[in-house]
Design a protein with these regions (language model features):
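Helix-start/capping segments and mature chain N-termini
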Residues: 26-108, 131-305
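Ordered, amphipathic secondary-structure segments that act as subunit-interaction surfaces
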Residues: 109-121
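Short, Lys/Arg-enriched N-terminal segments with co-localized hydrophobic residues
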Residues: 9, 13-28
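Short, internal active-site loops enriched in acidic
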Residues: 122-127
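Cationic, low-complexity basic patches in intrinsically disordered or flexible, solvent-exposed regions
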Residues: 5
Length: 305
């Protein structure tokens, strides 16, 4: 018997697929971590202190849901991963197909069939220096997967808004998340679930989610640009709207418009349909439950629930 795929780099920084024998009676794991070919439990994984992810947050990441050992929207996550790497000029010594094969193999090793899967790539391991490492230093791939209770949906999301002071490359899924961390903490301390970023009068996104609204039967969401992350769930909702005959407008909208929206929908990979009922302590949305349910049904149908 063989495990399927394991990525390692050659001295020419090209990936090769290596098949590794395993015993028939190998037990499944509670959780799993992977780092450049080594597999352990999450708590036992050791990562070099000179990994540039520690010094500079010099890397990118992705997170996906796993249902019945199948990675939901895997291709979308791989496309975004490679786009982010290209924008940061991080060289990836493997193809999308190789990464996808590795991830697909890793999630099979856990006891739980429903998982939260995370992976990141950093610019490599080298002594601290702001400049890119020289030749001979290849990127590092870290993966972990753990049991998950499943994608979350709610009709009771509470939001606050703050100025969006992040940098102008929010379309890159970078490890640099301090503004998002601070914003998420601010929401929690206010007794809320998420923070809405507002830049120059316009709503952009949330601390770890996209945000959209429904007004007069039209689904309205911020256009893809450098101010928001191209969310995978956002992408699929737009597709589902097309299938359901729901008009879509990709345009910037103001906080004032959000207050008067018929529905406010906060979306992410792990929280695909969070319906907001409060914004800055004011009641909002909750006026078109039928439309929201249609979108939720599309999601549940796709994950096989």
């Amino acid at each position: 018997m063989y495990t399927k795929y394991q990525i390692r780099r050659t001295t020419r920084h090209k990936a090769v697929l290596l098949e590794k024998k395993k015993k028939n009676n190998m037990e499944k794991m509670k959780d799993l971590a992977y780092y450049n070919g080594k597999i352990t439990s999450i708590d036992d994984m050791m990562i070099p202190a000179n990994d540039r992810g520690f010094y500079f947050g010099d890397g990118i990441y992705e997170a996906a849901m796993v249902f019945d050992y199948k990675i939901y929207a895997l291709q979308d996550h791989l496309d975004r991963m490679f786009n982010s790497a290209a924008m940061l000029r991080i060289e990836l010594p493997y193809t999308k197909e190789e990464v996808g094969a590795l991830l697909t193999d890793l999630v099979q090793k856990l006891e739980s069939s429903c998982q939260f899967l995370y992976w990141q790539v950093t610019r490599g391991t080298s002594p601290r220096n702001h400049l890119f490492p020289g030749e001979g230093v290849s990127s590092n791939l870290y993966v972990y997967s753990k049991p998950w209770k499943g994608a979350q949906m709610s009709d009771e999301y509470r939001l606050i808004s703050i100025p969006d002071t992040r940098f102008y490359h929010c379309n890159i899924k970078t490890l640099n998340l301090i503004p998002n961390v601070m914003a998420a903490q601010q929401a929690s301390e206010a007794g809320c679930n998420e923070t809405v970023f507002v830049r120059d009068g316009y709503v952009t996104e949330c601390s770890h989610s996209n945000i959209s609204m429904v007004k007069d039967g039209v689904f309205i969401t911020h256009p893809l640009d450098n101010l928001i992350l191209p969310g995978t769930e956002r992408k699929h909702i737009i597709r589902w709207c097309g299938e359901l005959g729901i008009p879509v407008k990709e345009r910037a909208f103001t906080l004032e418009e959000l207050y008067t929206a018929d529905e406010i929908l906060v979306t992410s990979t792990s929280h695909p349909s969070m319906r907001a009922m409060e914004l800055n302590q004011k009641a909002v949305g909750m006026k078109n439950p039928e439309l929201i349910q249609k979108l939720r049904d599309k999601y549940l149908n796709e994950i096989g629930k």
